[in-house]
Curated annotation (Swiss-Prot):
Pfam families: Sigma70_r2, Sigma70_r4_2. Residues 136-155 bind DNA. GO terms for biological process: carotenoid biosynthetic process; DNA-templated transcription initiation. This is RNA polymerase sigma factor CarQ. Residues 86-106 are annotated as: Disordered. It comes from Myxococcus xanthus. A motif (Polymerase core binding) lies at residues 39-52.
Length: 174
């Protein structure tokens, strides 16, 4: 990043090639929409280009990059909630709850559905800790909170997942 910040144009290509797969995976798990994740990946790296002058040498690049990606995902999810709320008011013919999709009963799908129902802060902490393997210290540094607060967010996410997946188990048993 320091080479790119100092004006080496080929350095950006190296950064993108090295980090894009990881960032896209993170974004895909956060928004659970491949096309949106791709758009957010592009927006993230566009922000890197625009913000390169604010990058401080010696700063760890991955947390800086993931902060940009996480903020992009949060903004997109916030926007989507507003769109969904508006659409649900406009479309009263659509039933409020659809039947579960019997064609794909896999645990992975149910887990991803449950993840989407978590508060964005909790989902981010769960994904970063359990999927990406980040420590609570790293998550705290990313979000500007204490490691204990990061742990609490993840714990609340785990509890909600247990609740949601338990409800699913009851529905399947009926």
């Amino acid at each position: 990043m320091e080479r790119f910040r100092d004006g080496a144009q080929d350095a950006f290509e190296d950064l993108f090639a090295r980090h894009a797969p990881r960032v896209q995976g993170f974004l895909a798990r956060m928004v659970r929409n491949g096309a949106l994740a791709e758009d957010l990946l592009q927006a993230t790296f566009l922000s890197v280009i625009r913000s390169r002058g604010r990058y401080e040498p010696g700063t760890r690049f991955i947390p800086w990059l993931m902060t940009i990606a996480a903020n992009a995902a949060r903004d997109a999810l916030r926007h989507q909630r507003h769109v969904d709320a508006y659409a649900s008011r406009e479309d009263t013919a659509t039933p409020a709850s659809a039947a579960p999709d019997d064609s794909d009963p896999s645990l992975r799908r149910h887990l991803l559905d449950a993840l989407q129902q978590l508060h964005p802060d909790h989902r981010e902490a769960v994904v970063l800790s359990k999927v990406e393997g980040w420590s609570f210290e790293e998550i705290g540094a990313l979000r500007g909170i204490s490691p204990g607060a990061a742990r609490l967010r993840a714990h609340r996410g785990y509890e909600k997942l247990r609740e949601l997946l338990g409800e699913l188990e009851l529905e399947v048993a009926r």
